[in-house]
Amino acid sequence: MFKRMAEFGPDSGGRVKGVTIVKPIVYGNVARYFGKKREEDGHTHQWTVYVKPYRNEDMSAYVKKIQFKLHESYGNPLRVVTKPPYEITETGWGEFEIIIKIFFIDPNERPVTLYHLLKLFQSDTNAMLGKKTVVSEFYDEMIFQDPTAMMQQLLTTSRQLTLGAYKHETEFAELEVKTREKLEAAKKKTSFEIAELKERLKASRETINCLKNEIRKLEEDDQTKDI
């Protein structure tokens, strides 16, 4: 049953144990060379940094805002985008690290922070000619382990972002499979470690109980001798 946000209460309905929801994302930048330095400011490129869903879905169903922290040389370096497309377009001449912070509608979910090195130049300098676009984007996954009831509802009720074809600059299908395999392997390893710890705990408790019984017997023997 669909609930309104206010109905969940200050704890967002509490944590839903045993639930894991994965939301794949793509983040990065594209850049275009002007062909020469711009006379008024010496800028050489126009670039766009972005965060977008890997699948065709509207992230605003669960994302409140995305914050992009640019280099201090830009006016108002802390940029905030509250609806799709989550992107910032600027011009410049140098590469620098951009800090991306994703905030969620549910205040009880901690923000996710990403770090992206803005790329303007091709590794092959000749590729820069002809105003060819430079692409630097990455696949990642936001994993919600034991989300709140509110967040679970938000994550499972998102709609399509566009009705047309939806694709990325980079082919991530193979990388997605590998990431899934790593995630499954990590889950199995964690389950094994938990089971192992439970066995150790059980053995420790049995040892403690044996020692307690021995101590009790010794105390009883001492009392008998005293009599």
Swiss-Prot record:
Q: Which Pfam families match?
A: YEATS (PF03366)
* Location of the region described as Interaction with MLLT10 in the Swiss-Prot/TrEMBL record: 163-227
The keyword Transcription appears for this protein: yes
Domain of life, per lineage: Eukaryota
| Example GO molecular function | histone H3K27ac reader activity
At which residues is there a site annotated Interacts with diacetylated histone H3?
A: 73
Q: Where is this cross-link: Glycyl lysine isopeptide (Lys-Gly) (interchain with G-Cter in SUMO2)?
A: 37
Tell me the segments the record calls region Diacetylated histone H3 binding. Answer: 93-97
Protein's recorded name: YEATS domain-containing protein 4
Q: Which organism is it from?
A: Mus musculus (Mouse)
